[in-house]
Amino acid sequence: EEALSVLSSKIKTLKSYEVAAVSGKLTDVETLYSAKLLFDKLNMHHYDCRYNFSQVPTKNRSDWLFNASIEGIDKADKLLIIGCDPKREVPIINARIRERWLSGFLDIRMLCVPDDLPYEGIHHGNDISLISQKTFLDTLQSFFSNAKNPIIILGDTIIKSNQGKLIHSQVKYLANKLNVIREDWNGFCFLTTDASRVGGLDIGFFPKKDGYCANKIKSRLSKEIKLLFLIEADDFVFDTSNSSDLTIVYIGHHGDIAAPLSDIILPSSAY
């Protein structure tokens, strides 16, 4: 009760644009939804569930979904993996790919992935700029020709850079051009390692209007942002050396990295 009273008093001293929130990889959707309702009611627009600075687009739901579904891997006959590490990031999907490959019905090509994955395929190196080159498109057109259930997996890891939106757009273009996306099949699969990411994007926990994304929030801490909510965002990395003018509120149950950095802690349920 005391913590809520202190927080309420703090919010009343600030302008709406001086408050921001970032959520983490395990934040439940109910908490995110409640937080969004509160921030919207208070006219606060700086919030984001993409704590890792992912540049995944937020207009089209199909842009952030694993559209073919995990079960869909069992029907795939051609697979292109771009910018992720299924072996370490998503073992369940990795095992499914391996099982399908062992059946002899799946051909695989890879770009910007580790070379120790438990299935064989053609590696195209680690230069992501290949996706914009005509020779690579020609190669893929030959590879995907006559494919019945083709899949392209794009990892969230590779779109964290400033070129992230462009990379996503180019891969989505390839998916349409190569008939990976059809009326009866959507093989464009965006791969995130965060349990809360799809739910967060589904309910709109990302900046709109004049809101700041996680990267902009980070760059404006203590300068413009005076109050920061970390909603189980233990993996949100930022510099605390110059945060004397910043009040940090931690909402969560793990009490991991972010909790000791906080001025106010609001415990939440662990389920």
Where is each model-derived feature located?
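Catalytic alpha/large subunits of respiratory electron-transfer oxidoreductases
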Residues: 1-271
